[in-house]
Amino acid sequence: MLIGVGTDIVQIPRIEKILHLYPELFAKKILTSKELKQFALLGKINHAAFLAKRFAAKEAVSKAFGVGIGQGINFKDITILNNDLGKPIVEVSSNYTNKLSPFNIHLSLADDYPVCVAFAVIESSYNVIRG
């Protein structure tokens, strides 16, 4: 059963400006501890694109859940990692997922300066959302 679909587009220069003003604060606001470890391994030239993709991905996932960031789910509730082939893998905090039946999140990310886009699809193997 389809739970939802979400998409988001982010202008990478917008993130570059935020990083210039708040170099560490912005990353700590939107990234989980696992993502911060990946972020620390990147060269500074890749920081803005990495953050833009994570921001867009988390917005897309929250929209697919039907709520949006700050309306029942937060940036820190969603972790975006990559498997060995680079495929994005989404982890959602149990604080949020306890309300849902088992589900799968499919996420696609793309960037071509100056924009990046994220597209998320959430599906469940059950027809019921627990309340």
From Swiss-Prot:
One Gene Ontology term from the biological process aspect of the record: fatty acid biosynthetic process
Enzyme Commission code: 2.7.8.7
Pfam families, alphabetized: ACPS (PF01648)
Alphabetized UniProt keyword annotations: Cytoplasm, Fatty acid biosynthesis, Fatty acid metabolism, Lipid biosynthesis, Lipid metabolism, Magnesium, Metal-binding, Transferase
Domain of life: Bacteria
An example Gene Ontology molecular-function term: magnesium ion binding
Location(s) in or outside the cell: Cytoplasm
GO cellular component, as recorded: cytoplasm
Cofactor(s) required for function per UniProt: Mg(2+)
Functional note: Transfers the 4'-phosphopantetheine moiety from coenzyme A to a Ser of acyl-carrier-protein.
Family: Belongs to the P-Pant transferase superfamily. AcpS family.
Protein name listed in UniProt: Holo-[acyl-carrier-protein] synthase
Species this chain originates from: Rickettsia rickettsii (strain Iowa)
Taxonomy of the source species: Bacteria, Pseudomonadati, Pseudomonadota, Alphaproteobacteria, Rickettsiales
Name of the coding gene: acpS
